[in-house]
């Protein structure tokens, strides 16, 4: 038994994996296990995982058939031994005191969820500092902050969760933007959320993972997720309902931007998105 299980899905990240794992193993908080989930990676990522496991007893490795990010996270959740769960994407890296900060806040505030801030990292660009807050909030207050999206994001990776939050919840397999599908259900399981938005997580936007020349129909699942969330949040009060609706509008804007960038405006869904925005936002 350990305090924290850190789950790292691994797939085709050979150039980035060592930096990621090294940043986790260098944490100032030391009572943790790292679960590296090799999701059928065709490169040497799986071998690198095994190498770390042979050198550090805190590292465990799962080798599985490729099933996608949600499937890999779920596999890690299923075997986690920690009282708390954290997630790190295998092409990202973290500050050495990230889990110390998250753990101290979740324990001190007797919270169900602890959140820190994220640096968005782009090749050749300096990470930008974002507004910071430090407060403990109710689930409703936390939901509003996440719906507004200017300080707290929906990402799974900059958070520390009580393990019980996932007792009957898993990430939706086969879905794009999986974090958006589960965030409302996660917050509904919380009573208190500790927020310290100091930026401790480096979210790397890989050029080879974002193809600006093509558009995938999976992008429409971002809209689907927030429409589902909007429906879940009906009857929660005017502020929540308005924020949820704004989030659906934002999802439509984001997908439309990707369609235009990819010069795929002939898609039949484009007219639907434009019609929605004209009737709900413009």
Which role fits each region the language model picked out?
Residues 1-25:
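N-proximal low-complexity "stem/linker" segments adjacent to membrane-targeting elements
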Residues 5-8, 35-36, 63, 188:
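Short hydrophobic beta-strand elements that form part
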Residues 23, 38-48:
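A conserved acidic beta->alpha catalytic loop
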Residues 31-40, 60-65, 90:
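Short beta-strand/loop segment that forms part of the nucleotide-sugar
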Residues 64-80:
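Glycine-rich, basic loop-to-helix element that forms the pyrophosphate-binding segment
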Residues 69, 90-194, 204, 208-217:
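Donor-binding/catalytic cores of nucleotide-activated saccharide
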Residues 85:
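Short aromatic/hydrophobic "clamp" motif used to bind/position activated sugar donors
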Residues 205-282:
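C-terminal subregions of glycosyltransferases and related glycan-biosynthesis enzymes
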């Amino acid at each position: 038994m350990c305090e924290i299980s850190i789950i790292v899905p691994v797939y085709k990240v050979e150039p980035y994996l060592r930096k990621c794992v090294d940043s986790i193993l260098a944490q100032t908080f030391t009572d943790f296990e790292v679960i590296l989930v090799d999701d059928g990676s065709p490169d040497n990522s799986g071998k690198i995982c095994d190498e770390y496991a042979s050198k550090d007893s805190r590292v465990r490795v799962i080798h599985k058939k490729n099933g996608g990010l949600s499937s890999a996270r779920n596999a890690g959740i299923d075997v986690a031994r920690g009282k708390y769960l954290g997630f790190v994407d295998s092409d990202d890296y973290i500050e050495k005191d990230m889990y110390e900060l998250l753990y101290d806040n979740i324990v001190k505030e007797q919270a169900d969820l602890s959140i820190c801030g994220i640096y968005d990292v782009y090749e050749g660009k300096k990470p930008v500092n974002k507004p910071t807050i430090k407060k403990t909030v109710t689930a409703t207050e936390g939901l509003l902050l996440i719906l507004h999206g200017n300080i707290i994001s929906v990402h799974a990776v900059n958070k520390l969760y009580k393990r019980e939050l996932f007792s009957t919840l898993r990430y939706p397999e086969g879905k794009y933007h999986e974090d958006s599908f589960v965030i409302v259900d996660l917050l509904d399981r919380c009573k208190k959320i500790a927020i310290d938005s100091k930026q401790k997580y480096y979210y790397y936007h890989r050029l080879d993972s974002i193809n600006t020349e093509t558009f995938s129909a999976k992008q429409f699942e971002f809209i689907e997720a927030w429409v589902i969330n909007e429906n879940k949040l009906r009857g929660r009060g005017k502020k929540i309902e308005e924020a949820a609706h704004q989030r659906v509008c934002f999802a439509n804007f984001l997908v439309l931007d990707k369609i235009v960038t990819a010069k795929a405006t002939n898609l039949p869904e484009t007219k639907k998105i434009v019609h929605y925005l004209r009737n709900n936002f413009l």
